[in-house]
Amino acid sequence: MKNVLLIGAGRFGRHIAMQLSPLGHQVMAVDTNEERINDVLPFVTNAQIGDSTNAEFLRSLGIGNFDVCFVTISGNFQNSLETTSLLKELGAKYVVSRAERDVQAKFLLRNGADNVVYPE
């Protein structure tokens, strides 16, 4: 069983939660949108509404306690990049970030991502 932090509870984030939940992993979801949090609640053990670009908010989650952190933010690459970087600064063990293009993947890998996925 792994402790997983899922930042971004949109379509891709919800899909990840749906895959991890039946395997017994403990998943915490974070999003700025209450509706998306409500949609992912059946598949996670905990969820919070918050800004993942805020270092104090992330620190309050206990980043070092998660085995893996997924950054699945879509539509705002700047927020995804900032979140990825902050996670590593705060002691994240392993960060998987979402990219839509190769140039985004390069930036993410240079700024803290251990792995990059292309969901579409």
Identify the residue ranges that each predicted region occupies:
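Cytosolic regulatory regions of ion transport systems
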Residues: 1-120
